[in-house]
Amino acid sequence: MEFRILRYDDLDRDTLYDILALRAEVFVVEQRCAYLDPDGRDKNCYHMICTENGKMKGYLRILPPGEFFKEASIGRVLVTDRRKGIATEMVRRALDFIFKELRQDTVRVEAQTYAVGLYGKFGFETVGEEFMDEGVPHIQMLYKRKS
């Protein structure tokens, strides 16, 4: 498996198409969330793609501080093959990127509640109450790296 983190301007058309198609497949079709996925933030984010033999296996987006929350954030996490550790590896690499490249020690996510365990493995803690977003239960989680 190959993992790459790219800025929006570094995405070629085919990769961008694959990202948007995969996001639509998971969030719009599977989860039946009828919302505008391209939310205007993609151009200011980093995009992690996981590929194997030229096929996209996973994706997540890294939002720099101030783009959505005051802290850096991870969102739109999805994989084509579940329960194979791909999401865990992508989150691990995203955190490493945030710590080393963005020089941030705090990360906030709005996790779908079924994914609390994924983030909990890394030390994220829930903050606030569960809420509904596009009909799907979510909760905010916060990670503060220890010095």
Please identify what each model-predicted range represents.
Residues 33-36, 45-49, 59, 71, ...:
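Short hydrophobic/aromatic beta-strand element in the GNAT-like acyltransferase core
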Residues 79, 84-96:
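Conserved acetyl-CoA-binding loop-helix of GNAT-fold acetyltransferases
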Residues 42-44, 68, 133-137:
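Short acidic/glycine-enriched loop/turn segments that link adjacent beta-strands
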Residues 112, 132-147:
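C-terminal "cap" of GNAT-fold acetyltransferases
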Residues 1-44, 51-55:
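Short amphipathic alpha-helix that is part of the acyltransferase structural core
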Residues 49, 55-64, 71-73, 78:
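Conserved beta-strand in the GNAT
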Residues 98-111:
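Conserved GNAT acetyl-CoA-binding A-motif
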Residues 120-130:
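Conserved acetyl-CoA-binding loop of GNAT-fold acetyltransferases
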